[in-house]
Regions:
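Inter-lobe coupling/hinge segments of SF2-like helicase ATPases
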Residues: 1-229
């Protein structure tokens, strides 16, 4: 969709994770190719066919399925062997009694854990948990386990190395920003912990929760919230 990309005979556009692209981005992809495709019967240009896919449709996308000229296909089943993810809201005061034992239980069972933070590092006046601070804290709490971190400011080869180590089971607990939201598949990860969960949208929480429950083992997602609502 960049200006310097030229399509000569593009007939089909497939947009995965459709909700992550803006309206202008999607429209640009269609309009920039419309002049390059010619209908044999009338000689007029046409836009390419469009297939969009998402598990977390935003309100605009849902409206298009109802009021727009779209054919809709629904995959209503989980892949074979998948189990529902147990999702729970937990308060900061309950971490020691409820969450930390769960982390130990999952790792001792041979499984792995994601821990999501909104910020990379602490900011003055902010109470949001950060990747670097949380990593240090968890390394002190769980000295027997391999705890590493991942965030978007790391070099690509550094990020690839961390994900390779996590996927191969060499990391027990991965503290990360939302860079793991899409495109990550580690079936052995069975516990997702999301700090400051009240600051995320439902679509993003759903995507993050979907990083676990990808194997045959039962999985859990804990949403840590300071809000009483």
């Amino acid at each position: 969709i960049t200006d310097d990309t030229i399509f000569n005979h593009l007939g089909l556009c497939i947009i995965d994770e459709q909700h992550r692209f803006g309206v202008n981005q999607r429209q640009k992809l269609l309009t920039k190719t419309a002049r390059n495709i010619i209908k044999p019967e009338d000689g007029k240009p046409r836009a390419p066919h469009l297939l969009t896919m998402t598990a977390t449709p935003i309100p605009r996308s849902l409206q298009l399925t109802v009021f727009g000229d779209l054919d809709v296909s629904v995959i209503g089943e989980l892949p074979q062997g998948r189990q529902p993810i147990d999702t729970r809201v937990i308060r900061q005061n309950d971490l020691k009694e409820q969450l930390y034992p769960k982390v130990r239980e999952e790792i001792n069972s041979g499984h792995q854990v994601y821990w999501i933070c909104r910020a990379i590092e602490d900011k003055p006046g902010s109470e949001t948990s950060s990747v670097k601070k949380q990593t240090k804290k968890l390394q002190e709490l769980f000295p027997k386990y391999k705890v590493e971190f991942l965030h978007g400011r790391m070099k690509p080869d550094e990020k690839d190395l961390i994900m390779e180590k996590f996927a191969s089971g060499k990391i027990d607990l991965l503290v990360s920003t939302t860079v793991v939201e899409v495109g990550v598949n580690v079936p052995n990860a069975t516990l997702m912990v999301i700090s400051d969960a009240e600051n995320y949208g439902l679509a993003q929480l759903h995507q993050l929760r979907g990083r676990v429950g990808r194997g045959s083992a039962s999985s859990c997602c804990y949403l840590i919230s300071a809000s009483e609502k």
